[in-house]
A protein has these predicted regions:
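Conserved non-transmembrane functional hotspots
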Residues: 1-40, 78-170
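Alpha-helical transmembrane segments and their immediate juxtamembrane boundary regions
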Residues: 32-85, 162-192
Length: 192
């Protein structure tokens, strides 16, 4: 494997590790924060419904019940939240170590590039990563992880090496979801 190919491989691993770390942090954030926000919003709507008749409808009540069920779903993950945080921290460390290896390989002259040494270092880090992965993630963590990875993490080396575009940065499912909402809004406004 050439030095250029190794840089691509390390960047690809970096993307997977960094995204995995952010997905764990996304799940952790959703578990910790969303139940409180859902409860607060539901309570606020309930209080305002006491003196704003438009809020005291069956539709609003149904939405509040759905919020309550969503809170119950989120609570199923509560006992595991420390595991998500710990996995995110360990995977972030692996991501940072991969960046160091990437920059070392990039700054090494072609004639001095040691494939075997680099491959061993990368394999060791990837073993650490795989030992910390958690496959069961909460609903919505994938979208939130995209935001956390592309907006919060210093990952220019991954973006530059893999030549990531906006297509890679926005989840396809979110584009479909937005299109579905727009279509539903158009249908609702044309029917009424």
């Amino acid at each position: 494997m050439t030095q250029t190919e190794m840089l691509k491989v390390i960047a690809r691993y970096g993307y997977n590790v960094g995204f995995g770390a952010k997905k764990n942090f996304a799940t952790y954030d959703i578990i910790c924060k969303s139940s409180g926000w859902i409860s607060f919003i539901s309570l606020a709507i309930g209080v305002f419904a006491l003196f704003i008749p438009q809020l005291a409808t069956n539709v609003i009540s149904a939405v509040l019940i759905i919020f309550g069920v969503a809170t119950m779903y989120i609570q199923f993950y509560d006992s595991e939240k420390e595991n998500y945080e710990a996995a995110g921290i360990e995977q972030t460390k692996v991501f940072n170590e991969l960046e160091v290896i990437y920059r070392n390989v990039r700054s090494t002259a072609n004639s001095n590039f040691d494939y075997d040494k680099t491959q061993k270092e990368v394999n060791l880090l990837m073993s650490k990563f795989y030992s910390t992965t958690i496959s069961k993630q909460i609903f919505g963590s994938n979208w939130y992880a995209h935001y956390k990875f592309f907006c919060e993490l210093e990952k220019d080396w991954v973006e530059d090496e893999l030549k990531l575009t906006i297509k890679d940065k926005v989840p396809l499912s979110s584009c479909f979801f937005v299109a579905l909402i727009i279509l539903a809004a158009i249908i609702c406004f044309t029917v009424s």
